[in-house]
Amino acid sequence: MEESQQQSTKFDAPPSPYVPSRVYLAQIYWKKPAIVVLRVLQFVFSLIAFSVMADLLHDVQGSIKSLSYTVAIGVLACAYALAQLSFSLWCVIRGATSSSGVTPLYQYATFICDQMSTYFLISAASATATLIDVSGVCGSNGSGTNLCSRSTASVTFAFLAFLAFSASSVLTGYYLVKCILKA
């Protein structure tokens, strides 16, 4: 009888391996609320920036082609921020454990995408800021006052979105370095 018990325990499943980097990465989203707040700010600022710029693009009837670039970058940044916000909230609600959470590959991808979004936003906002002044949309005769104020608001919100993305990029880079050093 004792021999049959030893045989049955001999084939039991081995205990699940402990992966410190996965456990650490899963704890980021529920122990560090700053990343969730930054994701909310990214989404809100990029949504306002691209919607105001899209309205401005509609009003100038596409005569300034590079405004389309700014709208496209704003849409991509807003979609990325919404996806990251959804995942962050999912981790917070679920209470991500060691078996279900983020992986180091996800952390690398997040860092790279945060960096790309940051640089695309700053390039689009700065190109639009100089283009608005050079193209004469904000004319000195006062004819483009409404267009000028909307373009200034859009560029301002794009710069605010840039700041939120850059702060998030710094945080994800910090967490990535800590993860690499722990592993």
Swiss-Prot record:
Keywords: Cell membrane, Glycoprotein, Membrane, Transmembrane, Transmembrane helix. Glycans are attached at residue 141. The chain crosses the membrane at residues 34-54, 73-93, 119-139, 157-177. The keyword Kinase does not apply. InterPro entries: CASP_dom. Its main location: membrane. Residues 55-72, 140-156 are extracellular. Residues 1-33, 94-118, 178-183 are cytoplasmic. It is a multi-pass membrane protein. GO terms for cellular component: plasma membrane. It is found in: Cell membrane. The keyword Repeat does not apply. Belongs to the Casparian strip membrane proteins (CASP) family. This is CASP-like protein UU1. The lineage of its organism: Eukaryota, Viridiplantae, Streptophyta, Embryophyta, Tracheophyta.
